[in-house]
Structures are given as C-alpha cells and as structure tokens.
Design a protein with these regions (language model features):
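Glycine-biased, small-residue-rich flexible motifs in mid-sequence functional cores and linkers
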Residues: 1-16, 28, 92-436
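Long amphipathic alpha-helical segments
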Residues: 1-89, 410, 414-416
C-alpha cells in the first residue's frame, strides 16, 4: 500500500498542514469516502472541493461534510492547540505512525480487491461497502499534547492496557504489575486516560520510571475526566496525550468507541485487565483482533461482573490468559514495522462493537449510527434546538430533523416549543403526530 498523504510536489508545508486540519475537522470520522477523495485529488484539492460543494460525484462525502464545510477555521484550531501546548501531525510527515495505522485501511483494501476480481462474491463487496459507510478508518491527523518532538509511538514498542472504569482493587493491582513489567522491557504503556484500569496503568508506568501515553475521546485542550488531570498532565510530559479530535471537541459515547481503534492500532499488543460483559474495552480487543495484533486477558472470578468480558475472551479463544506479569512481556514486539493489512476481512461493524460499561441495556441498544450521534449530542436537562445539534453530531440539519422524529417515536426524546431533550423516563404511550 502506498503511504498515506502523498501529494503533488511543491505544496507549501503550511498550506498542506491547514488542508489536513480542515479534513480532520470537517467530518465526524475519517470515512472511506473521505480517503477516496484524498487519494484521488490530494488533500489540498479535496478541501477545495468540499468547501465549494463540488462533490456531485460523491454524494456520501457530501453528506458527511455538509454540516461543517463552511465553518471550519484551520488557523483557529491550530491557535487553540498551540495555547494548550499541543501540535498537529498528519499523514506524510516523518513522525506520522504510518506502520501502526495503515492496517485501519484494510476495509478499503478488501473492497478494492473484491472489485478488481470482477465478481461480487455472493454480495460480499456490497456488504463491505455498507460497513465502510460507518467505519472509522485511518485518522486524517492527530493532535498531540506534550511528548517528544518526534512521536515516540512511531518506533518504540507499545503495550495497550485497558479495562473497566469500575475497577476492583485486584484489577488496579494487576494493571499496575503489567505496566511495570512493560516498562521493564522499555515499552510504552498506552491507554485511554479513563478512571479505573486506565489510570492505574498510566500511574504505574510513571512510578516505574517508564513512559506512558494516552489517547483521548475528546480534544486534547481539556483533559477528561478532570479527576485524572494530574495523571494526564504527567503523561503529556512523558510520551504524550493524543486525540484525533480537534481542540474544543467534547465527549460522546461513539467517540470513545471510535477512539478504541486507535489504541489497538498504535499498540503492538493489547491486554484487557477487567471488563464487564458490555465493556468498551472489549471493542478495543475486537479491533486488535481485526488488525491481527496479539490480545491477552486477565482471568478473574466467575462471580465477578467485572471479569465476565475477560473470561469470555479467554473461553472463546480470542485472547490468551495472562497468569503472571512476566508473561505479558513476550507479547510486545521488540520494534515497530509493517503489519499485515490485506489478509483479513474488515472489522466487525460498529453497531456490533457498541458496548457500554454497565452490562445493562442502554438507550443506544437498537439505534443506528445516525440516531446514536444525534442522541449523544442532546442533553437530558437542557432543551436544544435542532440547529444547535449540527456541530456536535456532525450531521446536516435536515437529517437531524428526520432522526429526531424517529427518536421521538421510540420515546427516547421529548419536544417543547421547537426544542428537544432526552427523555428522563421512557414514556409508555406511543407518540405520533410529530411536526417540525
């Protein structure tokens, strides 16, 4: 596969950087349609086509970028990043983690290969194309706060340690032991900066005198959760705090799920320490498996809800059981190099990977991608007009209005004088006769 971001010679680096910033911010996720346009036109011309709505030949990308096409200011985003001590890296730069992230393009590789073979293979290409509509692929840029001048994750061995936010003392202790063992073989400990297992792994790596990095599900200008701000500040001084989301981007559930693919891709191996049956950490494990990276899980008590997910990974032969801290060191590749990326089908659909951490049914069960994005952009306490949901959901207004109607019919949102919010309790009566 050719390196991401190759473009025509003679483009000013500042112009190129602003083009990538625009592409990074204009769509909610880096889709196949976005990358097809970048590969066809180059990043600078792709930006011009999106801004001028010259996308008649690509209605999918037109829909994905319509909501933000005229509002993105790359200069302002770069300024906000600089104020937070962050920088922007993009494909084509020497510090871009090309080897690690290239496997995220596998769905497009499979689609193109099936097309070149000249057969639909019983509808397989159509299925892959449908999955590509909602899958996040290679990010179009990363915002990096702190860390060395050249991203350490590019060349150093990396171990991801992930798990539940509701960690037990056992889970926190094991996460710390695994992190210390990774540091002992000069590996960077990577996690998501969350409460529970994540912060235990970060802190243990730092305490052992090693390096740690965090991948956030929001902009790096504000650390989240605030309770972990101290740990995240130290991680920024270590290997860095990263995000694919521009400064000012807030937290939503689907951004956590999209973020998990980056943790899996940037790591040489992934260990799940504690995870409930529907833990988001399991989506990281799924991505690691789809990218053909080693997966391990820490077995736990059959009576512990926090170990149900880990025990299932081991039972189903999707992860090896870790029975001592020393065992984890054998999973970590000694160096970073090309990963296989054309030998396996696309990862499972995002809908199948949309886990919550509670182990209980959630309002997201049964919702498609558009419905989840609108629902996440809403508040349970503050009424909002449909126009206010455009930026947060990354969807055009007409689509938001349509989705609100469906959510209303399901009893998940309520309306008052043209404004909307999430229902605090789900109504039992069927709601009809909705007008905008």
């Amino acid at each position: 596969m050719t390196q991401r971001g190759k473009t025509r010679d003679g483009v000013d680096p500042a112009v190129l950087e602003r083009a990538w910033v625009y592409l990074n911010a204009v769509a909610e996720r880096p889709s196949a349609a976005m990358w097809d346009a970048i590969d066809t036109y180059g990043p600078v011309e792709a930006v011009e086509r999106i801004r001028t709505r010259n996308l008649r030949s690509d209605p999918v990308l037109d829909r994905q970028t319509e909501a933000r096409a005229e509002t993105i200011d790359p200069g302002e985003l770069l300024h906000r990043a600089a104020e937070a001590g962050a920088r922007f890296i993009h494909p084509g730069r020497p510090d871009w983690p090309e080897y690690a992230l290239s496997a995220l393009d596998r769905p497009r590789v499979l689609r193109d290969r099936l097309g070149s073979e000249g057969s639909d293979d019983n509808g397989r290409r159509k299925k892959v194309a449908a999955e590509l509509a909602t899958l996040s692929l290679i990010p179009t840029g990363l915002w990096v706060r702190g860390g060395p001048a050249e991203l350490a994750l590019v060349s150093a061995p990396v171990l991801a340690i992930v798990g539940t936010r509701s960690a037990s003392q056992y889970g926190r202790s094991v996460a710390g032991e695994l992190a210390a063992a990774a540091v002992g073989v000069d590996a960077i400990v990577l996690s998501g900066g969350a409460l529970g297992i994540d912060v235990a792994a970060h802190n243990a790596a730092l305490a052992a005198g090693g390096e740690t990095a965090a991948v956030l599900a929001r902009g790096v200008d504000q650390f989240y959760p605030s309770a972990n701000a101290g740990t995240l500040s130290r991680a920024a001084e270590s290997a860095g705090v990263l995000s694919e989301y521009p400064p000012g981007t807030g937290v939503t559930r689907y951004r956590f799920l999209d973020r998990n693919r980056l943790i899996a891709a940037l790591s040489g191996a992934t260990v799940v320490v504690e995870a409930a049956a529907r833990s988001g950490a399991l989506s990281t494990a799924r991505w690691a498996g789809a990218l053909e990276r080693p997966i391990a899980a820490v077995p736990g008590s059959i009576h512990s809800r926090g170990s149900v997910g880990c025990n299932a990974l081991i039972r189903d032969h999707r992860a090896i059981a870790i029975t001592s801290a020393a065992e984890v060191t054998g999973l970590i590749p000694a160096h970073r190099g090309p990963y296989p990326h054309e030998t396996r089908d696309a990862p499972v659909s995002r809908a199948d990977s949309a886990y919550s951490g509670s182990g209980q049914p959630t309002p997201f069960d049964g919702l498609d991608d558009s419905q989840r994005r609108v629902f996440e952009a809403m508040s349970g306490s503050r009424w909002r007009r449909p126009e206010e949901l455009v930026a947060d959901s990354g969807m055009p207004l007409r689509s938001i209005r349509s989705v609100l109607g469906g959510l209303f019919a399901e009893g998940l949102v309520e309306r008052r004088e043209g404004m909307w919010r999430r229902c605090r309790t789900k109504p039992t009566a069927v709601q009809t006769s909705l007008t905008f």
